[in-house]
Each structure stands twice: as structure tokens, then as C-alpha cells.
């Protein structure tokens, strides 16, 4: 694919590029690569001026650059064609899609699949080997169900949704259109509902529903639990990493991003566009406002306001957390100084 062809795919975001001043230099691009691993014929990207040293060292043929004239000149000097944009990483993501298409099997129902007679399977659906689809299940048009998936009764899967191998969809689950559930994920299993009694822990039946709205992505080995009553709900276009625990009755807004090993106790409510970095933990019934961000390993025990950035355990405002970190390594010396002052004060009083 010629560099000019790639530019044409970007539309209005691809108007500032090296071909404007040098239209004859239009090399063939055969793939994409990280800038430090790029080879001749590949396209890569640079996010900001601090990565300028990579531009002079890379073997990439083409680069996506920020709107920085110095980087553009440096690329030109090194014979690299370029296109500039306000968001290089976003444009690079679009470029990858030009060279790589995810595996999509041809629609068919494998003879080893077990499908209950009451299940409804839409058109152009792929059902792989050893899939189990139980009674009352509804599968939308164009869905892809990879090998060994188990779908419990009273479940609905939306159009064009993909269920990867070995994931499990429990009863009373509703999954919207264009969702992706990765391998090993478990959607709608019983929430951790036990009530103390004189004879031990009494199991509270989890009779509610688990709802994933359109465009949700769930990573490998993530669990999203079904509540005793009501719903556990994940809003549209929310993306969830591997190994995430979402407790029963959680309400997650639209456009959220939840990184690996984050965990939410029951009844947590996230607003829209919330970001939880890896290993964030949220206590029972906590509310997180729209656009809030929690950095890695944050422990949240109380509500977080919209747009707030928090860090640490227990969670505190991010700027305060940075000050605490700056003091932390000095605590032993500060403690020794305090002991000396205490001794001096005691001696002066004797």
C-alpha cells in the first residue's frame, strides 16, 4: 500500500503530511511496528517531542507525528515520510486496522455443538465445536461463538457479538450488540451473597439480571456477577481488561475503562468515562463520579467526585498523594530528628 493511499484513508485528519512538499517520495508501506522495532517499509508513530531521539534512530519508512515542526523537519532530514496529527496514537490505531483484520470464521454451526430446541439462533452465526446453548437462549444475527462456550438458559446475545473460546454466560444475562467477551470470562455467575445466621452462612439466591449494553469489551478471566435482585449493568462502549472482578449489583456507566486486577465490591456505581488503573479496589456501595480517575493500586473507601483524580490507600487527591510520596522516603531521617528534638526538650526541662 502506498503512503498516499494510507493518507487518503484518514480523511480530514490526514491533510498535513510530507507529500505536500515532496509528492514524488511516496514509498510502499507493508506493515506497522513500534518505533524502536520498525524496519524498512513499516509505519510507526511518535507521541510527543520527548521521543524525538527515536526519529533519528528508527528504521521506519513512515511516521505519524504530533503537530511539531521540529519533529517533521527531523523526519524529513532522515528520509522518512510523515503525517502529523493532534493525536498520533489514535491515528496509529486506525492505521493498524488497514493492515490487520481479526480472525472471523465463516458462518456455520459445528456438528458437535449442542443447541436446545427452544433456542433461537439468528442468521450468519458461527457456532464452534462443543458449544452448549441451553433452553430459551436467543443469539442475534452475525454473532460468533467460539469453541467450548457455554450459554445458560434465559440468555440473550446481541447482533455481531463475539464470545471467545471457553467463556461462560450464566442464566438471566443480557448482552448487547457488537460486544466482545474474551476467553475464560464468566458473565452472570452468582454474586457473593451470604447472610450470617445462627447455623452459619445462609445463601441468598441471586435472582437478578446481568446486563451488558452495546459495544462492551470484557477481557480474559474477568467475572461480572449477577445480583440477588435488580441488575448488574455495564454501560455501552465500556472496556474491561483481564482479571477484573465486578461484584453483584454494580452499575458501571458508559465509556469507562477498567484495567487488570481491578475489583469492585457489590453495589458500586461508576459514572460515565471513569478510568480505573490496575489493581484499583473499590469498597461496597461507593459512588465514583463522571470522568474520575483512580491510579494503579488505589483503594477507594468513600465516594469520589466527578472529574477527581485519586491515588493511594485510602484514596486521597492525586496532588496530595505526590506530596506524601515525596515525604515517604525521608520518614526514617525525620523520625531520628524528632527523637533528637524530644531528647533535647526533655533535657532542657530536667
From Swiss-Prot:
A Pfam family recorded for this sequence: Hexapep
Enzyme Commission no: 2.3.1.191
Coiled-coil zones: none
Example of a GO MF term: N-acyltransferase activity
Listed GO biological process terms: lipid A biosynthetic process
Domain of life: Bacteria
Disulfide bond entries: none
Enzyme class: transferase
Reaction(s) this enzyme catalyzes, per UniProt: a UDP-3-O-[(3R)-3-hydroxyacyl]-alpha-D-glucosamine + a (3R)-hydroxyacyl-[ACP] = a UDP-2-N,3-O-bis[(3R)-3-hydroxyacyl]-alpha-D-glucosamine + holo-[ACP] + H(+)
Assembly description: Homotrimer.
Purpose of the protein: Catalyzes the N-acylation of UDP-3-O-acylglucosamine using 3-hydroxyacyl-ACP as the acyl donor. Is involved in the biosynthesis of lipid A, a phosphorylated glycolipid that anchors the lipopolysaccharide to the outer membrane of the cell.
Protein name per its UniProtKB record: UDP-3-O-acylglucosamine N-acyltransferase
Naturally occurring in which organism (per UniProt): Nostoc punctiforme (strain ATCC 29133 / PCC 73102)
Amino acid at each position: 500500500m502506498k503512503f498516499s493511499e494510507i493518507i487518503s484513508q484518514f480523511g480530514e485528519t490526514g491533510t498535513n503530511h510530507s507529500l505536500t512538499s515532496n509528492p514524488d517520495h511516496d514509498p510502499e508501506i507493508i506493515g506497522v511496528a513500534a518505533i524502536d522495532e520498525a524496519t524498512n517499509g513499516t509505519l510507526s508513530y511518535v507521541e510527543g517531542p520527548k521521543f524525538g531521539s527515536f526519529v533519528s534512530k528508527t528504521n521506519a519508512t513512515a511516521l505519524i507525528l504530533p503537530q511539531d515542526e521540529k519533529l517533521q523537519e527531523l523526519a524529513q532530514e532522515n528520509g522518512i515520510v510523515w503525517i502529523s496529527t493532534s493525536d498520533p496514537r489514535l491515528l496509529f490505531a486506525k492505521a493498524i486496522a488497514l493492515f490487520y483484520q481479526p480472525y472471523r470464521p465463516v458462518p456455520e454451526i459445528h456438528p458437535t455443538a449442542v443447541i436446545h430446541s427452544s433456542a433461537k439462533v439468528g442468521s450468519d452465526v458461527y457456532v464452534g465445536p462443543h458449544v452448549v446453548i441451553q433452553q430459551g437462549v436467543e443469539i442475534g444475527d452475525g454473532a460468533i461463538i467460539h469453541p467450548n462456550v457455554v450459554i445458560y438458559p434465559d440468555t440473550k446475545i446481541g447482533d455481531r457479538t463475539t464470545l471467545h473460546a471457553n467463556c461462560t454466560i450464566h442464566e438471566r444475562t443480557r448482552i448487547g450488540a457488537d460486544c466482545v467477551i474474551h476467553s475464560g470470562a464468566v458473565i452472570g455467575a452468582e454474586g457473593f451473597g451470604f447472610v450470617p445466621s445462627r447455623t452459619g452462612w445462609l445463601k441468598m439466591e441471586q435472582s437478578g439480571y446481568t446486563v451488558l449494553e452495546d459495544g462492551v469489551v470484557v477481557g480474559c478471566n474477568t467475572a461480572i456477577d449477577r445480583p440477588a435482585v435488580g441488575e448488574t449493568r455495564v454501560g455501552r462502549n465500556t472496556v474491561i481488561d483481564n482479571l477484573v472482578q465486578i461484584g453483584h449489583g454494580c452499575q458501571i456507566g458508559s465509556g469507562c475503562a477498567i484495567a487488570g486486577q481491578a475489583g469492585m465490591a457489590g453495589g458500586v456505581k461508576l459514572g460515565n468515562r471513569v478510568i480505573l488503573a490496575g489493581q484499583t479496589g473499590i469498597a461496597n456501595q461507593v459512588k465514583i463520579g463522571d470522568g474520575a480517575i483512580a491510579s494503579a493500586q488505589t483503594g477507594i473507601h468513600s465516594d469520589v467526585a466527578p472529574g477527581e483524580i485519586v491515588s493511594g490507600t485510602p484514596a486521597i487527591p492525586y496532588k496530595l498523594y505526590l506530596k506524601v510520596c515525596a515525604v515517604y522516603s525521608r520518614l526514617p531521617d525525620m523520625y531520628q530528628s524528632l527523637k533528637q528534638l524530644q531528647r533535647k526538650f526533655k533535657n532542657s526541662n530536667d
